[in-house]
Amino acid sequence: MDQFIKQDETGDLIETGMNVANHFLSAPIQGTNSLSKATIIPGVAPVLIGNPEQKNIQYPTTSHQGSKSKGRGSGARPIIVSSSEGGTGGTQVPEPLFAQTGQGGIVTTVYQDPTIQPTGSYRSVELAKIGKERMINRFVEKPRTSTPVTEFKRGAGSGCSRPDNPRGGHRREWSLSWVQGEVRVFEWCNPICSPITAAARFHSCKCGNCPAKCDQCERDYGPP
């Protein structure tokens, strides 16, 4: 079988291709009409038959985000996730985490090792990673041989921090923040009857048994 195309066959192929191109260029474009068998001249370009369609993707505009409509709408609908957790209550801890009067919390800075100085475009990411590891290790006790190792969880504490404690109590919580090239840790106390949320929040007592202050948060309010 001859694999080379003759000169007269080349001319026929070029002419056929031009005819196909002119056919589609001259045809009007109507909305979302796509390529189908009915729009192709039989015997002209059989290879085009069966090609996948190119669907028109409609993106929602900002004016439609968050609105509710009856029926089925066209286009993709965005998934809107609220930045705050609904139903958890409490007061959100401000960002960046600075100590503020009357809120009952302290801010400490996790200083970096001067011998470790990452460079390049990922410098901030590397410094934040180092600071996070040091902050976590700061509040995690070393494994004991007599007791099983438990996973670190924000809000974990001593026996008085158990939610089932009838006398009430406080639990210590921590939040990590990256502020102006430094890793800062904000510490505060919440009543044990309040939920442990992913977002850093101040909560008030709901059961009536939790004290206003405990031995953990007395230093948060400064000298009396």
UniProtKB/Swiss-Prot annotation:
Compositional bias segments (type: Polar residues): 55-65
Query: Which cysteines does the record link by disulfide bonds?
Result: none
UniProt signal peptide: none
What keywords is this UniProt entry annotated with? Host cytoplasm, Host-virus interaction, Inhibition of host innate immune response by virus, Inhibition of host interferon signaling pathway by virus, Inhibition of host MDA5 by virus, Inhibition of host RLR pathway by virus, Inhibition of host STAT1 by virus, Inhibition of host STAT2 by virus, Interferon antiviral system evasion, Metal-binding, Viral immunoevasion, Virion, Zinc
Q: Tell me the residue numbers annotated for binding Zn(2+) 2.
A: C193, C205, C207, C210
Q: Which GO terms describe its molecular function?
A: metal ion binding
One cellular component GO annotation, for this chain's record? host cell cytoplasm
Locations listed in the record: Virion; Host cytoplasm
> Which GO annotations describe the biological process of this protein?
symbiont-mediated suppression of host cytoplasmic pattern recognition receptor signaling pathway via inhibition of MDA-5 activity; symbiont-mediated suppression of host JAK-STAT cascade via inhibition of STAT1 activity; symbiont-mediated suppression of host JAK-STAT cascade via inhibition of STAT2 activity; symbiont-mediated suppression of host type I interferon-mediated signaling pathway
| Matching InterPro entries | Paramyx_V_Zn-bd
Instruction: List positions binding Zn(2+) 1.
Output: H170, C189, C214, C217
Q: Where is this region: Disordered?
A: 55-90, 145-172
> What Pfam families does the entry give?
zf-Paramyx-P
Function according to Swiss-Prot or TrEMBL = Plays an essential role in the inhibition of host immune response. Prevents the establishment of cellular antiviral state by blocking interferon-alpha/beta (IFN-alpha/beta) production and signaling pathway. Interacts with host IFIH1/MDA5 and DHX58/LGP2 to inhibit the transduction pathway involved in the activation of IFN-beta promoter, thus protecting the virus against cell antiviral state. Blocks the type I and II interferon signaling pathways by interacting with host STAT1, STAT2 and STAT3, and mediating their ubiquitination and subsequent proteasomal degradation.
As for family, the record states:
Belongs to the paramyxoviruses V protein family.
What is the protein's quaternary organization? Interacts with host IFIH1/MDA5 and DHX58/LGP2. Forms with host DDB1, CUL4A, STAT1, STAT2 and STAT3 the mumps virus V-dependent complex (VDC).
Q: What is this protein called?
A: Non-structural protein V
Species of the source: Mumps virus genotype B (strain Miyahara vaccine) (MuV)
Organism taxonomic ancestry: Viruses, Riboviria, Orthornavirae, Negarnaviricota, Haploviricotina
